[in-house]
């Protein structure tokens, strides 16, 4: 038989983690003792990576909040005197979009030093033209550079702190721990490339 501690269940949110635990408990209550059910490992991707990295001493446990990323983006735009827009428009519209773009790119493990400026500008222009953008070629190329600069400035601003994407990337680089015989991923079709690598790394 399979030992409960050899089972790892992974979800994307804390809410889903609780729902999964409740479902397992309800379905298993009459078949297995509660003490065995409690030994099943149920985590979010981030909590699993965080626990391993802190227990192993790879990170201090300080997590960067969303406000730090937003402030870093705004600070970079202002330092470069980027974009001829009002501050309220930059703060309310552009910064959130840049923040989401950075998180999306990091979810694929792409760091700012891996981005080729000319190629990025080319791809941005192609994508923008396909959507009949109102922005000029010069504006699109300039914004691409400002985006990469903001991303780099954010990465440079961190010391011992990590954000949620860093956690997953660091886990992949550092994990030498135990593997699980059975790994169950809730909503597996929603995994990105980094999360898929984590599952492959921890599954026997």
Predicted regions and their residues:
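Conserved P-loop NTPase-based nucleic-acid remodeling module centered on helicase motor cores
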Residues: 6, 11-103
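Short alpha-helix boundary/capping elements
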Residues: 16, 49, 106-110, 175-176, ...
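Generic structural signal for hydrophobic core residues of well-folded globular domains
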Residues: 52, 56, 105-106, 171, ...
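Post-Walker A helix-loop "phosphate-sensing" segment adjacent to the P-loop in P-loop NTPases
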Residues: 1-5
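A general structural motif at alpha-helix termini
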Residues: 11, 24, 119, 168-171
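Coupling/switch/interface segments within P-loop NTPase motor domains and analogous charged loops
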Residues: 67-156
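Short, mixed-charge, low-aromatic patches
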Residues: 26-31, 124-130, 183-193
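Conserved helicase NTPase motor core
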Residues: 41, 136-204
């Amino acid at each position: 038989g399979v030992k409960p501690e050899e089972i790892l269940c992974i979800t994307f949110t804390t809410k889903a983690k609780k729902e999964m635990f409740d479902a397992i408990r309800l379905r298993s209550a009459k078949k297995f003792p509660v003490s065995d059910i409690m030994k099943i490992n149920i985590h979010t991707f981030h909590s699993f990576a965080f626990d391993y990295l802190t227990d192993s001493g790879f990170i201090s446990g300080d997590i960067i909040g969303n406000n730090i990323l937003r402030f870093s983006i705004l600070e970079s735009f202002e330092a470069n005197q980027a974009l001829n827009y009002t501050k309220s428009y930059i703060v309310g519209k552009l910064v959130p979009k840049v923040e989401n773009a950075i998180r999306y790119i990091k979810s694929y493990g792409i760091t700012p030093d891996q981005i080729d400026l000319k190629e990025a500008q080319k791809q941005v222009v192609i994508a923008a033209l396909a959507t009949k953008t109102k922005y000029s070629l010069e504006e699109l190329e300039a914004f691409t550079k400002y985006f990469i600069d903001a991303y780099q400035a954010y990465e440079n601003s961190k010391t011992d702190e990590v954000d949620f994407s860093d956690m997953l990337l660091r886990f992949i680089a550092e994990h030498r721990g135990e593997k699980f015989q059975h790994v169950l991923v809730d909503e597996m079709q929603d995994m990105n490339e980094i999360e898929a690598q984590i599952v492959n790394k921890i599954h026997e």
